[in-house]
Structure formats: C-alpha cells, structure tokens
Amino acid sequence: MVIPPPIPSGVPKSSRWKIPLIVIGVIVGLLIVFGIQIAFWSFSAREFELSTSQKESVITIDYASEFFLIDKDVGIEEWDCQRFIDGSIQIYYLYVDESTSLDCTISVERNRGDSLASYIAEWQTLKLRNEFSEVKVEIEATDKVFSWGDDSKFAFQLSDDTRNGFAFIARKDNKIFFVDAWGLLLEDPEEISEFLTPKLEIFAAESYLD
C-alpha cells in the first residue's frame, strides 16, 4: 500500500480554507461597519427653519453693516441649520467677499459635557485653520477685552503683525456662540461690547431645542 506524503507541519489541511474565509469575513465586516457609519452620518442630521428670534441671535452681515462700512451686495451669504439625531443643533452663517469674511456659529448640545467639548474643539479648529491657511493668521488672545457667559475667549487676528479681525467664543449652559470676523475690526472694549452683547443676550434667552 502506498502511504500518502505527510502534510507539512504548521499548515494543517483543515486550515487551508479557514485563512481565506477569515480574511473575507474581516473585509465584509469592515465594509458593513463603514456602510453603517455612512448611513448614520447621512441620516442623523436634518435641516430646520429658524424662528425669528433664533435668526436674530446670529451676527449677520446686515447687522455688521450697522457698525462697519460694508458693500454687502458684492459678497455671498450662506446659511446651514442642522438638527442631529441626539437632538443637538448647529446654526451656521457665513458671509464672504474679496476682503471680508464673517462666520457665526451657534451650537446647542444636550448636556454640559458635550458643550464643553464643542467649546474647546471650535476654538482649536480656528487656530488650526489660521495656522495652515494660505495667508498665515496669528491669534492674539486677550480675554480682558471682552468676556461673557460661563466660559469665553476673545482674540484679535493678525496678518503680518497687523490686526485685521477678531474671534470670540462663549459658552452659556449647553450653548456655544462663536464668531470669526476677518476684515472687520473693533479694538475698543466698549465698541466690542456694543457689537456682541445685543446678540449674546438674544442667544442667552433662546432655548433653541423647544
């Protein structure tokens, strides 16, 4: 009787099909997870219409034109209002022209922990965006100029050591108010307060989540 050759050690005969099946299973699993993530982000946010008071809480180019000489007709405005699956919301406003940009974002979270995380992330994003922009923008933090709410940060924004804008962020309870202005400059603390405070008071009184 002819004895069959021995199976090489370390590669059991029954495992020859297991390895490809495991690899295929891992790939399929990753694709499923990836698909679930895509579906989650695609369906977790819904646009919503702002109420009059909610819209009034946002710093827009129309409001800024009461303080600055702006030819607002030459720029582009953008609104994006999203309500997420956990009930949190984000209101995003942007105006841009050749020399001016104005970004005002309001975020409302479901709890204090999330609001603190959003508060920190928003400011860090500003710093990173300025660091890697085509024209490097420096942040001159000076919280003594203006403060508000439970937490806040104020900074002038500089290019070539010259102030040409400012940024401000504040947290009140579970709400975050952020404004990033370029080509719009106020340096006097009283003028800055006159510009920001009316909108912040509306922001503080508005619940947004009702």
Predicted regions: what they are:
Residues A45-L50, V135-D210:
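A short, solvent-exposed beta-edge/loop patch
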Residues C104-E140, F195:
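Long, charged/polar, surface-exposed segments that mediate recognition or autoinhibition
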Residues I22-I38:
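Hydrophobic membrane-insertion alpha-helices, especially the h-region
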Residues G35-D103, E131-S147, L200-A204, L209-D210:
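N-terminal "mature-domain start" segment
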Residues E98-T105, G113-Y119, T162-G165, F178, ...:
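Short, surface-exposed beta-strand/loop "edge" segments at domain boundaries and coil↔beta transitions
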Residues K13-V23:
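N-terminal export and membrane-targeting signals
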Residues M1-S15:
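Low-complexity, intrinsically disordered extramembrane tails and loops of integral membrane proteins
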